[in-house]
Amino acid sequence: MSTVYETLYILRPDLTDEQVELAIAKYQNLLQEQGATDLEVQNRGKRRLAYEIKKQRDGFYVQFNYNAPGKAIAILERAMRLSEEVIRYLTVKQEVTKEKEDKVAVTA
């Protein structure tokens, strides 16, 4: 059973563009290995933080939207928690609107 999730995470500002791309690819591959589908990646770029986090004032914002089983979230968040490149992350379960449910039912 897959659920629609959105994960937003912030990477350290001192990473190079290549390191940012590698980090995005690492978490993208991790999700795909855990059975995530319809993965959309949005690199929102470097932005100023509203307040200081881990002595950082800026960060690279990255957003994932995807369908995945619940166990994939725990694995993804554990990897982010242990990583030194991620300074903050948040995963939320998306509400599926009635229109999308009807569209899924028609295509199935």
Curated annotation (Swiss-Prot):
SUPFAM superfamilies: Ribosomal protein S6. Signal peptide: none annotated. Keywords: Ribonucleoprotein, Ribosomal protein, RNA-binding, rRNA-binding. PROSITE patterns: RIBOSOMAL_S6. One of its GO terms (biological process) is translation. Gene3D superfamilies: 3.30.70.60. GO terms for cellular component: cytoplasm; ribonucleoprotein complex; ribosome. It comes from the Bacteria. The keyword Nuclease does not apply. One of its GO terms (molecular function) is structural constituent of ribosome. Binds together with bS18 to 16S ribosomal RNA. Belongs to the bacterial ribosomal protein bS6 family. This is Small ribosomal subunit protein bS6. It comes from Nostoc sp. (strain PCC 7120 / SAG 25.82 / UTEX 2576).
